[in-house]
């Protein structure tokens, strides 16, 4: 077996964290031959819950789990890590405006960005799951910039990507394995653009483009997009809790593919720092289609847009620029 990977999960006492840690520990994310040292971080008030999660992981008797430790301070959490799942964030409460939510999260992700710079390896790879994920990733990357390159920071839009795959499979009466290359553009929010223009569906051994497979353009430009955009809210309405199982699976898919690479001819959606591709402002954490090889993602180039797609992408870009500006103002206001 190879040397253990040290993997941090923040917010590990919460629902999503609880669902993520088992997938990391049992080899789903990094493979059955790769031992992991799991570090679970949460606030001191959750130390008892964290200890219970540690006990459960020990009781799973997993060959790939080299060690597991629960911590409540950033130095212990971030020291020497290879991967970070930043799940913990301030949730939006009733009556809270976006700027208030951003201000609360700026403090958390500024602190974690600085901790990454001070204690983590320069090769550490980071996925931000806690919302607003794109902007939280932007802030963490900003404060870790002296040590960890921006390309090592990402935010999760794989949940939206997986939701889009599932809806397309349901509509065409096939299975997930027969659908590929959906794209989530932009923010992990209600403005995201789930795009199937370049997606394909394999039915009865024949691969066809998604629009032809569905045969209903109005559906793909209306209800399909709305279903993916609003899915999280619908699940809260039904369960009275936010998506946890599906969010954890998506975070693990995201890191699995970053670690092992994407399959030939397939791309996935990741929110990563823009390099100016498709006219998206440089540095904005924006969901793009990417391919991954050797642990490095690349934005898929040369895709074309119609006016409908351009309008959707412009709307999500505008929202992300506003979020970024509000977050930077919160940094200034808090003198951080």
UniProtKB/Swiss-Prot annotation:
InterPro entries: L-lactate/malate_DH, Lactate/malate_DH_C, Lactate/malate_DH_N, Lactate_DH/Glyco_Ohase_4_C, Malate_DH_AS, Malate_DH_NAD-dep_euk, Malate_DH_type2, NAD(P)-bd_dom_sf
Its EC number(s): 1.1.1.37
UniProt: NAD(+) binding residues: 11-17, 42, 105, 112, 129-131
Cross-referenced SUPFAM superfamilies: LDH C-terminal domain-like, NAD(P)-binding Rossmann-fold domains
Keyword Membrane: no
Gene Ontology terms describing biological process: malate metabolic process; NADH metabolic process; oxaloacetate metabolic process; tricarboxylic acid cycle
Temperature dependence: Optimum temperature is 40 degrees Celsius.
Species this protein is from: Caenorhabditis elegans
Gene Ontology molecular function: any one: L-malate dehydrogenase (NAD+) activity
Residues noted as binding substrate in the record, renumbered to the chain: 92, 98, 131, 163
Protein name listed in UniProt: Malate dehydrogenase, cytoplasmic
Pfam family, one: Ldh_1_N
Keyword Kinase: no
Cross-referenced CDD domains: MDH_cytoplasmic_cytosolic (cd01336)
């Amino acid at each position: 077996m190879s040397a253990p990977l040290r993997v941090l999960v923040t917010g590990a006492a919460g629902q999503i964290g609880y669902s993520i840690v088992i997938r990391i520990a049992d080899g789903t994310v990094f493979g059955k031959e790769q031992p992991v040292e799991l570090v679970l971080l949460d606030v001191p008030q959750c130390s008892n819950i964290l200890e219970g999660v540690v006990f459960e992981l020990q009781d799973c008797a997993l060959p790939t789990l080299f060690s597991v430790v629960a911590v409540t301070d950033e130095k212990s959490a971030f020291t020497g890590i290879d991967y970070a799942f930043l799940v913990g964030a301030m949730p939006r409460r009733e009556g809270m405006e976006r700027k208030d939510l951003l201000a609360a999260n700026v403090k958390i992700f500024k602190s974690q960005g600085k901790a990454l710079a001070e204690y983590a390896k320069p090769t550490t790879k980071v996925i931000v799951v806690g919302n607003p994920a794109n902007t939280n990733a932007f802030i963490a990357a900003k404060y870790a910039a002296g040590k960890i390159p921006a390309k090592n920071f990402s935010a999760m839009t794989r949940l939206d990507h997986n939701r889009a795959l599932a809806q397309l499979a349901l509509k065409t009466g096939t299975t997930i394995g027969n659908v590929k290359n959906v794209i989530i553009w932009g923010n992990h929010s209600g403005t995201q653009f789930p795009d199937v223009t370049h997606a394909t569906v394999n039915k009865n051994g024949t691969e066809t483009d998604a629009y032809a497979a569905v045969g209903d353009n109005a559906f793909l430009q209306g209800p399909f997009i709305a279903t993916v955009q609003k899915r999280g809210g619908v699940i809260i309405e039904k369960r009275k809790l936010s998506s946890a199982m599906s969010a954890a699976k998506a975070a693990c898919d995201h890191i699995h593919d970053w670690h092992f690479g994407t399959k030939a001819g397939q791309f996935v959606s990741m929110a990563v720092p823009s390099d100016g591709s498709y006219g998206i402002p440089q540095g904005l954490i924006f969901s793009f289609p990417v391919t991954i090889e050797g642990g490095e993602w690349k934005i898929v180039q040369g895709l074309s847009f119609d006016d409908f797609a351009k309008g959707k992408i412009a709307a999500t870009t505008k929202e992300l620029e506003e979020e970024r500006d509000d977050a930077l103002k919160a940094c200034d206001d808090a003198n951080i």
